Design a protein with these regions (language model features):
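Domain-level signature for soluble enzymes in the chorismate/prephenate branch of the shikimate pathway
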Residues: 1-187
């Protein structure tokens, strides 16, 4: 087994044993299928109860009100740096503390119901995901296609699943949840 597989097994065993005591309510920046959702599941395992929340501050409110025991929000990424709203919420909600960090490699996929790149008329994605993939877009002459910003890459995948003339930049899991074929991985 690879070291990644061993680590994944260890984390799942750890999460299951912790949840045998009491299933955890975990709030995360949603919707389902976001990278934050993936991070939450990798840390807390299959036995926890997950609550997708539409904003970072909303996750903090759930924690502050006792509706969730843990929250998962982005705090930093390699391309855009610190996530300002998360830092602001850490100052505002003084009783909410960081108890663990989750390091996660982000790998975007380019997905579409359409098999022909030349037939794609618009690309959905969160602005951050779109900006992170500028080299891919340039290399495939896609940077002139209309970009439609979304609240999350998971929402982008959903919208692409409804329109064959569109594509999305999203996570692999968001593509699978929304049944949108992956044209390119790790873009």
């Amino acid at each position: 087994l690879s070291s990644e597989a061993i680590e994944a097994i260890y984390l799942e065993i750890f999460a299951v044993s912790r949840n045998l005591e009491l299933p955890q309510k975990v709030a995360f920046l949603g919707p389902v299928g976001t990278y934050t959702h993936q991070a939450a599941e990798s840390r807390f395992g299959a036995m926890s109860s997950y609550m997708p929340i539409s904003s970072i501050e909303g996750v903090f409110r759930e924690l502050n009100n006792g509706e969730a025991k843990y929250g998962v929000v982005p705090i930093e990424n390699n391309t855009e740096g610190a996530v300002g709203i998360t830092l602001d919420c850490l100052r505002k909600y003084e009783n909410v503390k960081i108890v663990a960090e989750i390091y996660m490699d982000i790998h975007h996929s380019f997905v579409s119901l359409n098999e022909n790149l030349s037939d794609i008329k618009k690309i959905y994605s969160h602005p951050q995901g779109y900006n992170q993939c500028h080299k891919f877009l340039d290399d495939h002459n896609l940077n002139s296609i209309e970009f439609i910003p979304t609240k999350s890459t998971a929402q982008a995948a959903y919208l692409a699943s409804q329109d064959p003339s569109s594509a999305a930049i999203c996570s692999k899991i968001a593509a699978h949840i929304n049944k949108v074929p992956i044209m390119f991985e790790k873009i």
